[in-house]
């Protein structure tokens, strides 16, 4: 057995022992639904005044109107 093969065998053995140890410590228990919601919950955000807006409901002011930008183009922006 050469050095590379021995290293691979030790790496696999350490991985197997680590997985068994994690399983005994509850490392592979599934998340509860509340935990998943807490982890992936998005905080409510809104688009501030003067920024472009695709929809009215995303503006902090709940108002999105067409305005002329610095290039003379009509763009929707939050009021």
Curated annotation (Swiss-Prot):
Per the UniProt entry, the signal peptide is: 1-22
Name the residues that span the membrane.
none
| GO BP term (any one) | defense response
One GO MF term attached to the UniProt entry: calcium channel inhibitor activity
| Keyword Disulfide bond recorded | yes
Site entry: Critical for insecticidal activity: 52, 69
Where does it primarily localize? secreted
Propeptide positions: 23-40
Q: According to the lineage, what is the superkingdom? A: Eukaryota
Q: Which GO terms describe its cellular component?
A: extracellular region
Which tissues does it occur in? Expressed by the venom gland.
In which compartments does the protein localize? Answer: Secreted
Q: Which Pfam families match?
A: Omega-toxin
Instruction: Recite the UniProt keywords alphabetically.
Output: Calcium channel impairing toxin, Cleavage on pair of basic residues, Disulfide bond, Ion channel impairing toxin, Knottin, Secreted, Signal, Toxin, Voltage-gated calcium channel impairing toxin
Question: Which cysteine pairs are covalently linked by disulfides here?
Answer: 46-60, 53-64, 59-78
InterPro entries the record matches: Omega-atracotox (IPR009415)
Per the entry's comment, what about the domains? Answer: The presence of a 'disulfide through disulfide knot' structurally defines this protein as a knottin.
The record's family statement is: Belongs to the neurotoxin 08 (Shiva) family. 01 (omega toxin) subfamily.
- Describe the function of this protein: Inhibits insect, but not mammalian, voltage-gated calcium channels (Cav).
Q: What's this protein's name?
A: Omega-hexatoxin-Hi1f
Give the originating organism.
Hadronyche infensa (Fraser island funnel-web spider)
């Amino acid at each position: 057995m050469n050095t590379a093969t021995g290293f691979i065998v030790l790496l696999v053995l350490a991985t197997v022992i680590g997985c068994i140890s994690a399983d005994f410590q509850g490392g592979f228990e599934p998340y509860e639904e509340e935990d998943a919601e807490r982890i992936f919950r998005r905080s409510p955000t809104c688009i501030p005044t003067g920024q472009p807006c695709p929809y009215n409901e995303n503006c902090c002011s709940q108002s999105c109107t067409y305005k002329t930008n610095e290039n003379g183009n009509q763009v929707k922006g939050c009021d």
